């Protein structure tokens, strides 16, 4: 009989979702770099992405500039890595010691070099064009540590995937979802009179944002910008995540406790505003709200808008669409164009 894998005091049977970070990692970051959290908060181009993978016993605390990961502190099996992890392209910008023991002044230099390097502009902002990464940072900050007393929800996770014990279990667990998606894509091709891409995928990778409102509803939010064709297809991608999380919520009776623990940890370390502490719902409602966010939606053609609505009505009729009130504030409002 095959033994079940015990991780962090619980058993991984098929899937897992537990992104609360190792406390040892956070303690060491606070001791060695007590300035780092306030530094990120004071720079509008920066945001946090954090996580944990109980299967590999790995936790991470990353700093992003748009969609570019510029620094990661990580731990494995409770041991904190001495050297920060970063993509090779960013390592070229600074001396090796920076990635072992960064200082605020060095970080200023690092950011200036990133901003002036052409190949990194696509991750955040070109001279006149605000890319998807710009809005990801803007919205990510707005609904975490910049959350307001009047807000009904917070974002508690970003760029995430559901974990699986094995690749075989993942394929088996997802099969009914992929089959359902594939059937609807076939139906779309038969019923939609406009032009569609030759290839439309039934399954996808990372969720952009997960949110939680005061009613206990989970919000799945997919961000699109600068690619109208992908905006039109976003209900298909969001439907995949919706079906995945719906199934996970049915099967994982500890999901609420793990989400609550993540949120409380982030509040304790200042990654989510303290005003939300008394708003955490007592349980999940069972409702999942699928959403697309278009940072700036005024440039979408009528063809794209019509295609989006057709696909939405087929895949996720309840899907909501949002846009930002401004390019500097990040508050979400219902899109009038979608």
Sequence positions of predicted segments:
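Charged, terminal alpha-helix-loop-beta segments
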Residues: 1-338
């Amino acid at each position: 009989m095959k033994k079940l894998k015990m991780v962090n005091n619980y058993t991984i049977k098929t899937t897992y979702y537990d992104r609360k970070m190792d406390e040892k990692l956070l303690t060491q970051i606070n001791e060695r770099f007590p300035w780092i959290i306030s530094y990120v908060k004071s720079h509008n181009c920066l945001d946090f992405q954090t996580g944990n993978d109980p299967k590999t016993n790995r936790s991470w605390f990353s700093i992003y500039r748009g969609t570019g990961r510029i620094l990661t502190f990580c731990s494995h099996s409770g041991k904190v890595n001495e050297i920060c992890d970063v993509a090779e392209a960013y390592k070229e910008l600074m001396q090796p010691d920076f990635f072992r023991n960064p200082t605020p002044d060095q970080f200023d230099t690092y950011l200036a070099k990133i901003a002036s390097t052409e190949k990194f502009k696509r991750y955040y902002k070109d001279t006149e064009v605000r890319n998807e990464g710009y809005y990801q940072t803007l919205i990510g900050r707005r609904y975490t540590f910049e959350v307001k007393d009047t807000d009904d929800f917070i974002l508690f996770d970003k760029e995430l995937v559901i974990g699986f014990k094995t690749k075989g279990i993942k394929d088996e667990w997802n099969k009914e979802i992929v089959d359902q998606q594939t059937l609807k894509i076939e139906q779309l091709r038969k019923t939609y009179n406009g032009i569609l891409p030759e290839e439309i995928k039934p399954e996808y990778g990372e969720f952009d944002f997960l949110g939680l409102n005061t009613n206990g509803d989970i919000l799945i939010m997919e961000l699109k910008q600068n690619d109208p064709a992908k905006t039109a297809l976003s209900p298909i991608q969001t439907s995949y995540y919706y079906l995945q999380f719906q199934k996970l919520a049915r099967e994982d009776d500890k999901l609420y406790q793990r989400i609550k623990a993540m949120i409380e940890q982030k509040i304790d370390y200042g990654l989510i505003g303290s005003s939300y502490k008394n708003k955490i719902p007592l349980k999940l409602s069972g409702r999942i709200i699928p959403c697309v966010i278009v940072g700036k939606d005024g440039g979408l053609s009528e063809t794209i808008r019509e295609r989006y609505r057709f696909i939405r009505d087929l895949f996720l009729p309840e899907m909501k669409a949002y846009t930002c009130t401004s390019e500097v504030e990040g508050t979400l409002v219902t899109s009038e164009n979608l």
